[in-house]
Amino acid sequence: VPPDEPEPEASVLQGATEGNGIDIVLMGDAFSVQEINDGTYESVMEDVMDYFFDVEPFRSYRHLFNVHMVTIASEQSGYAEGIDTPLQCRYGDGNSITGSDASAFRYARLAVPEERMDEVLVIAVLNSDTFGGTCYMYPPDKGDSANGISVAYIPAVDMKIHLCGLVQHEACGHG
């Protein structure tokens, strides 16, 4: 983290009201300190959370989820050639997005204890209006292959219908 940027920090957007909760960790990439300070970052993360729970069966089971937000500042807003971001997100072929899954999981550990990380869904929101999206899933070493950690990369596209669809497709559908 450059000296003029705040350290990444975790907060809770929603706590499960029943059981231990299923953990989702939201984080952004290429959001500036100004966008964090003016509330843009948190507003985008809250929108993503609401879109996640806007479809069944997630709507009916919302009370079973813990939703965490990890706030990460980038040197600048958005993406430009030659600029590194905390999650190292990049657009690939077609609509694919890559990033540093290891970095995403490292930041997620600020919000979720290590013993709960094996089934976390990370939703990494790119500060970009370029359409795309990809989810990477990692099965656990043991047990049910339907379990495991995953990270969904989704751009914060301007149009609500597109962002909502991306969240539901990548995070709800694949994650």
Describe the residue ranges of each PLM region:
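Propeptide-to-catalytic entry region of secreted or membrane-anchored zinc metalloproteases
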Residues: 2-118, 126-131
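Short pre-active-site segment immediately N-terminal to the catalytic Zn-binding motif
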Residues: 31, 35-42, 144-171
